[in-house]
């Protein structure tokens, strides 16, 4: 339940300009999650969400990363071109790639040096990433989606 709620929170803050815990709680309640402001507050802390300025006057919740930028545009291209889909099983992230692309995509992910990823192995078209926690797995999935969408 908590994992689903965290996933929904990440989707909501990516889609809407949510500026307060009350706004987020209302959206989650409208989506069928029975949450209080206190629950939302804990979730925000656990997901390491931050408030960022929208226009100098308003703020919104966002995921911020202090990770290093991607080493090369080539890695981004490989990640974008080779990526097919991803799914999670607890703290294991499974990434499907185009046939023969898993090792290259895995190298691109390793080059990101994200602290949440403990390690990864690649086959022909599948990558398995061991991630520190379930919440970190959701964050990594969100980061990968943003990289693919923004490039």
Curated annotation (Swiss-Prot):
Q: In which pathway does it act?
A: Amino-acid biosynthesis; L-arginine biosynthesis [regulation]
UniProt GO BP: L-arginine biosynthetic process; protein complex oligomerization; regulation of arginine biosynthetic process
Q: What S-S linkages are listed for this chain?
A: none
Chief place where the protein resides: cytoplasm
Q: From which domain of life does this come? A: Bacteria
Cellular component annotations (GO), alphabetically ordered: cytoplasm
Q: Which GO terms describe its molecular function?
A: arginine binding; DNA binding; DNA-binding transcription factor activity
Database matches in InterPro entries: Arg_repress, Arg_repress_C, Arg_repress_C_sf, Arg_repress_DNA-bd, WH-like_DNA-bd_sf, WH_DNA-bd_sf
Q: Which residues form the signal peptide?
A: none
Q: Which UniProt keywords apply?
A: Amino-acid biosynthesis, Arginine biosynthesis, Cytoplasm, DNA-binding, Repressor, Transcription, Transcription regulation
Localisation: Cytoplasm
Q: Kindly give the SUPFAM superfamilies that the UniProt entry links to this protein.
A: C-terminal domain of arginine repressor, Winged helix' DNA-binding domain
PANTHER family for this protein: ARGININE REPRESSOR (PTHR34471:SF1)
| Official protein name in the record | Arginine repressor
């Amino acid at each position: 339940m908590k994992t689903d709620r965290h996933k929904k929170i990440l989707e909501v803050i990516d889609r809407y300009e949510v500026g307060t815990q009350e706004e987020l709680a209302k959206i989650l309640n409208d989506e069928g999650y029975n949450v209080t402001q206190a629950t939302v507050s804990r979730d925000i802390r656990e997901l390491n969400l931050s408030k960022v300025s929208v226009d100098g006057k308003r703020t919104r919740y966002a995921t911020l990363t202090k990770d290093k930028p991607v080493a090369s545009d080539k890695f981004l291209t490989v990640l974008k071109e080779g990526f097919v889909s991803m799914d999670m099983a607890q703290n294991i992230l499974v990434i499907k790639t185009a046939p023969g692309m898993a090792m290259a995509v895995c190298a691109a992910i390793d080059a990101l040096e994200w602290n949440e990823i403990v390690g990864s192995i690649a086959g022909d078209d599948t990558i398995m990433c061991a991630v520190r926690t379930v919440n970190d797995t959701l964050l990594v999935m969100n980061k990968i989606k943003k990289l693919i969408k923004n490039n």
